[in-house]
Amino acid sequence: MLNRFSYSSNAWHNLRVDGPDADGIAVIVLARSQSRNALTLPMLTDMIQLLSAMDADDSVKCIVFTGEGQFFCSGVDLTEGFGEIGKTRDTHRDAGGKLALAIHNCCKPTIAAINGTAVGVGITMTLPMSIRIAAKTAKISFPFVRREIVADAASSFYLPRLIGYGRALHLFTTGALYSAESGLLHGLFSETVNSASSTLPRALEVARDIAINTSQVGGCLTRDLIYRSSQSPEQAHLLESAILYTRYQSRDFKEGVKSFLEKRKPRFQDTMREQSGEGVLERGDCVVGLASKPKL
């Protein structure tokens, strides 16, 4: 197991990190309430660093994101701009996209506790997360066309897959502000809760259930299977079969069966880091996607 890292002792830019606690739950708080938790480039960079560290830390079982105060995140801080633009179109990389990919590539389950308004990258950064729980009072907007730009943070990939092309096009085309309970957002949130103050406690309940009762490897590979988007049931069947063959031989599979028969909670130990180290079903190769991934 990797040495436990003290996340809270580091001077992150406008981020507060709580945990991981005894169950392995870490909370990343966007702590810039005086600016509606608008993101700066140092905040984006720090979140990517945090995700990398937590992904490699065996003591972290689940990561929860939330916002300080009444907002979840009002998007990029426009007073600071969008960061350095690449020298050419081919070399420029969207900062929000870098964060989205860091979340996507993190093996640990991620949960967004959307306690208030989420706009622009404030909502698109949550799309790669495993679960989104929002306050019914939260307002949501994808305002890119109102700023003469296009969707960011790989949201043109995620949003249609989460809510369908029709709803995604409506949200992107209008750029308007909608209630979290709007029918246009149907399917985006796993749950909506009555108040902003209930959002984080509910997210922590879900996180604790995941941390205590599920296999890290099984959860990560299942998510990868879903996003791989097999083109036919036959393709899905072949890939699932290959992964199942490997998992049937794992200690966690044996523990899962044994704990069920003994009517107790499982004590899973396998990690994705260990699986990759053994050369079994590498992510980005035979698990998720093509033999060679696009060069970024």
UniProtKB/Swiss-Prot annotation:
Its EC number is 4.2.1.17. Pathway: Mycotoxin biosynthesis. A motif (Peroxisomal targeting signal type 1) lies at residues 294-296. One of its GO terms (cellular component) is peroxisome. It is an enzyme of class 4 (lyase). One of its GO terms (molecular function) is enoyl-CoA hydratase activity. The keyword Disulfide bond does not apply. Keywords: Lyase, Peroxisome, Virulence. It is found in: Peroxisome. InterPro entries: ClpP/crotonase-like_dom_sf (IPR029045), ECH/Chromodomain_protein (IPR051053), Enoyl-CoA_hydra/iso (IPR001753). Signal peptide: none annotated. It catalyses: a (3S)-3-hydroxyacyl-CoA = a (2E)-enoyl-CoA + H2O; a 4-saturated-(3S)-3-hydroxyacyl-CoA = a (3E)-enoyl-CoA + H2O. Belongs to the enoyl-CoA hydratase/isomerase family. Gene clusters encoding host-selective toxins (HSTs) are localized on conditionally dispensable chromosomes (CDCs), also called supernumerary chromosomes, where they are present in multiple copies. The CDCs are not essential for saprophytic growth but controls host-selective pathogenicity. Enoyl-CoA hydratase; part of the gene clusters that mediate the biosynthesis of the host-selective toxins (HSTs) AK-toxins responsible for Japanese pear black spot disease by the Japanese pear pathotype. AK-toxins are esters of 9,10-epoxy 8-hydroxy 9-methyldecatrienoic acid (EDA). On cellular level, AK-toxins affect plasma membrane of susceptible cells and cause a sudden increase in loss of K(+) after a few minutes of toxin treatment. PANTHER family: ENOYL-COA HYDRATASE_ISOMERASE FAMILY PROTEIN (AFU_ORTHOLOGUE AFUA_1G01890), PTHR43684. This is Enoyl-CoA hydratase AKT3-2. The lineage of its organism: Eukaryota, Fungi, Dikarya, Ascomycota, Pezizomycotina.
